[in-house]
Structures are given as C-alpha cells and as structure tokens.
Amino acid sequence: MRWEDFRTSSNVEDRRGMGLPGGAGGLGIGTIVILGLLGWALGIDPRILIGGAEMMTGGGSGYQQQQGRQGTPQDEMGRFASAVLGNTEDVWSTVLPQQANRQYQAPKLVLFSDATRSGCGGAQSAMGPFYCPLDQTVYIDLSFFEEMQRRFRAGGDFAYAYVLAHEVGHHVENQLGILPRVQERQQQVGRAEANQLSVRVELMADCLAGVWAHHSNQRWRSLEPGDIEEAIHAAEAIGDDRLQKQSQGRVVPDSFTHGSSEQRMRWLTTGLKAGQIQACDTFRASRL
Ligand SMILES: [Zn+2]
C-alpha cells in the first residue's frame, strides 16, 4: 500500500511506554498479545456487545484521564497508524455526508503498550485492538501487527490498515446509530441470537473497511498489486472458525462473534468493490 502521501491525523494520542500503576500483571507480553489476537477475532473487540455490560459499569467510576503525547509519532509504525487514520478521516468525511447525509465526527486513536485506561474500562494488549463507543476511541497496541505476521503469516501494511479500518468501521456504525440499537436488542435476546447480532456488526465493519479502501484507492491510488490478497488473507486467517479450530480443535458456530473466514473475506470484498455503505447492510442481507 502506498501510504506515504496520506495526511497524518491529529487525533492520535501516543501512550506507549507510559505503563500503568501496577502494570499488566504477571502475564508476559507474548502471552498477552497472542490472547489479543484471539480476542480480536473471537469478538472481544466491540466490548460493548456480548459480555460487555460489566465493562461499561466498571468503566465510568474508576476512569482516570491518562494523557499521552499528541502529534505524529516519529517511529515507522506509529506514523503508519497515524497516516491510515488520517486517510480514513479524509474518506469518511466525504463519503458519510454523500451516502448517509451525516457529518463525520472523527474518532480518536490511542496507541498504548501493555495496558491503559479507556472509556470502556481497563484496556490490555490481550484484548486486541478495539473501539470504545463511550469515548469514541480506537485502542491498539501496535505489537498486534507483529503478531499477525509472526503467528498467522498475515502481515503487510494493507493487512494492518484493514485492522485499523475495521475498528474505524465500528465508529462509522456508531455514527449511524447502529451500535446502540444492536446493544439494546442484545439485552433482550438469548445468547445465540446475541452472537448472531455481533457477527452482523463485525461483518459490517469488515465491509466498511472495504468501502474505505475503495475510496482511498480511487483518490490516492493507494492500492498496489497484492494488497487486496494480503487483506483477504488476513481476514481469512482471523476468521472465527479458523481460530476456534486452532484453539479448541472444533468449530462452534453459535459462539461465532466475528464471522467465519469465508464471511469476513466476502464482506470485505463486497465493500471494496461497491464503495457503498448501503452494500454493507448485513442486517438486511439474506445471506450473511
Ligand atoms: Zn470488530
């Protein structure tokens, strides 16, 4: 991916190396990041959803403001994250008014290492990247990308950009009013149906990441040969079925919260081809 021409975002806060009083506990960083990789694909990231209620109640009272460095990070990965976020801002601030008749309010991005505080409660690398709707912020420990490469051979800048764009996709869902409605519904239904709703939310975020890539490529010619395959490979590697097989040795469809590899690939491709928010309506789709 050609990202050197992307405008870097001014919405990045860099908390790397700041740590937390008490740290991340006894877990080594390797363990934490592997758990995070599983977490990301198994549905921990929209923590407001299933099982997230306790996080939200826990989030408010103990929430202490932690201030990181503002401005564009100097290191390569930090600059990359800032550039991709800046590009999602440029795309969505055009596309959202055009296609959904809404102004785009950009989210914040917090880079952290090991552990930090979020508006949704404590954040650890173990959780993988996630979006917190309460403070409209994406949280990521960038070592997640190294693990994608190392554990799943799912590396590459466009694959990493897809991860960030997926989280920004949750923010777009939030802006569209979808997240609050889904959350409310999830509290009224059983576990299996609540999981189904999560899958729809996740596949929509994959599709919206595709919509971003479509417009980014149209305006900045950002995609290079092999990029799409790279992101599709990442989507495939981190599908719920694949990860469940690796961790449990069997597949349990009812507990899918992100969608299977095939579904993730297909919805990412759908958004990428169409470039339309409407094409991402996983709630109306007859086939997920
Ligand atoms: Zn997600």
Residue ranges of predicted features:
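A Zn2+-metalloprotease active-site environment signal
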Residues: 6-17, 24, 28-257, 265-288
